[in-house]
From Swiss-Prot:
Cofactor, how bound (note): Binds 1 Mg(2+) ion per subunit.
Disulfide bonds: none
Pathway: Purine metabolism; AMP biosynthesis via de novo pathway; AMP from IMP: step 1/2
Cofactor or coenzyme needed: Mg(2+)
Compartment list: Cytoplasm
Function: Plays an important role in the de novo pathway of purine nucleotide biosynthesis. Catalyzes the first committed step in the biosynthesis of AMP from IMP.
Protein name, as recorded: Adenylosuccinate synthetase
Ligand binding (substrate): 300-306
Lineage: Bacteria, Pseudomonadati, Pseudomonadota, Gammaproteobacteria, Enterobacterales
Reactions catalysed: IMP + L-aspartate + GTP = N(6)-(1,2-dicarboxyethyl)-AMP + GDP + phosphate + 2 H(+)
Length: 432
């Protein structure tokens, strides 16, 4: 039996993690975010009602689940309050269900200003960040000058620290980026107005999780973005600023690494990517447009159109290696309905003619790569809303089997629609 289950993306994000976390939390006591910030966009559809969460864990919609934001998450007080209000306006009691680590770094206005100024300065070489201050906040954390949730317990000291760090960043904004300085008093006033709300939710997350482990409680760890956006293992520098892989669970929550029991990798039936960066299987033809339209591939956070392409088994195998995946959840299978043929990338042809079956790490080394495809028959029957494996077309079953063969990982869950009811659980991670 797996008490501590990790759910993470195996591609470039947007795989459908939010729905699956929400579904599996029916049995969980706690749901923990361990990395990223409000650059995530987790979409849940419950009884036809759509909810988009950016910062608060997806378990917040469950009455008997406690949601936790761990120390690996960079926390925007403004974004958190906005999201809390949106949920509370719908009658969802967030403050009674949400806990914070006091070690969460804070994202403040100057982080956002730096993020925007840097992207503007990069011009055509822009990374394609969400412009929400995620990277600059992680920079401050590593540089040991960042402000954290726990600093709000001593408001006078917080004000002094804020003044010092803002002098540093405003100097960059004005003198290097030729941008406007951020007003110190406004930042201080905005944070102080909600400081007591934030500190009232603080808990020792590592200790809480250890006690939960000893009691045998079920805990779900919710990843954001995807493996191929990991700061170390992704398509650097076109990556996010945190560890999106399973290793981030221990460092971003305080759970001992030996206590992770099952790692569920969410894999979309095709590939998508938002923003710049390598994407070998990207489609620029009518099939790419079909995938975008049928899959409603527009970012939940930015609204940007996602780039679309065929499933890249080479890249997914890298995710399998890094995360030691226990099983897959295959999402958006129904988007492929109606295609005469479907393709899977099984290797890369390098510019010098060599054929390889592993991914490069640096983005520059992806240039000139051509995907090697395996083509399979498509299916005309609908898979949308199918709730039994036996109800899937044989061609769809063959596609699923081929994914398992190419990756060495079983497909334990199949999603055939956006609602939590449109799901087949072939093997429950909490029972694995």
């Amino acid at each position: 039996m797996g008490n501590n289950v990790v759910v993470l993306g195996t591609q470039w994000g947007d795989e459908g993690k939010g729905k699956i976390v929400d579904l599996l939390t029916e049995r969980a006591k706690y749901v923990v975010r361990y990395q990223g910030g409000h650059n995530a966009g987790h979409t849940l559809v419950i009884n036809g009602e759509k909810t988009v969460l950016h910062l608060i864990p997806s378990g917040i919609l469950r009455e008997n689940v406690t949601s936790i934001i761990g120390n690996g998450v960079v926390l925007s007080p403004a974004a958190l309050m906005k999201e809390m209000k949106g949920l509370e306006d719908r009658g969802i009691p967030v403050r009674e269900r949400l806990l914070l680590s006091e070690a969460c770094p804070l994202i403040l206005d100057y982080h956002v200003a730096l993020d925007v100024a840097r992207e503007k300065a990069r011009g055509a070489k822009a990374i394609g960040t969400t412009g929400r201050g995620i990277g600059p906040a992680y920079e401050d954390k590593v540089a040991r000058r960042g402000l954290r949730v726990g600093d709000l317990f001593d408001k006078a000291t917080f004000a002094d620290k804020l003044k010092e760090v803002m002098e540093y960043h405003n100097f960059q904004l004005v003198n290097f980026y030729k941008a406007e300085a951020v007003d110190y008093q406004k930042v201080l006033d905005d944070v102080m107005a909600i400081a007591d709300i934030l500190t009232s939710m603080v808990v020792d997350v590592s200790d809480l999780l250890d006690q939960a482990r000893q009691r045998g409680d079920f805990v779900m760890f919710e990843g954001a973005q995807g493996t191929l956006l990991d700061i170390d293992h992704g398509t650097y520098p076109y990556v996010t600023s945190s560890n999106t892989t399973a290793g981030g669970v221990a460092t971003g929550s305080g759970l001992g690494p030996r206590y992770v029991d099952y790692v569920l990798g969410i894999i979309k039936a095709y590939s998508t990517r938002v923003g710049a960066g390598p994407f070998p299987t990207e489609l620029f033809d009518e099939t790419g447009e079909f995938l975008c339209k049928q899959g409603n591939e527009f970012g939940a956070t930015t609204g940007r159109r996602r780039r679309t392409g065929w499933l890249d088994a080479v890249a997914v195998r890298r995710a399998v290696q890094i995360n030691s995946l226990s099983g897959f959840c295959l999402t958006k299978l129904d988007v492929l309905d109606g295609l005469k043929e479907v393709k899977i990338c099984v290797g890369y042809r390098m510019p010098d003619g060599r054929e390889v079956t592993t991914t490069p790490l640096a983005a520059d080394n992806w240039e000139g790569i051509e995907p090697i495809y395996e083509t399979m028959p498509g299916w005309s029957e609908t898979t949308f809303g199918v709730k039994e494996r036996s109800g899937l077309p044989q061609a769809a079953l063959n596609y699923i089997q081929r994914i398992e063969e190419l990756t060495g990982v079983p497909v334990d869950i199949i999603s055939t629609g956006p609602d939590r009811t449109e799901t087949m659980i072939l093997r429950d991670p909490f029972d694995a």
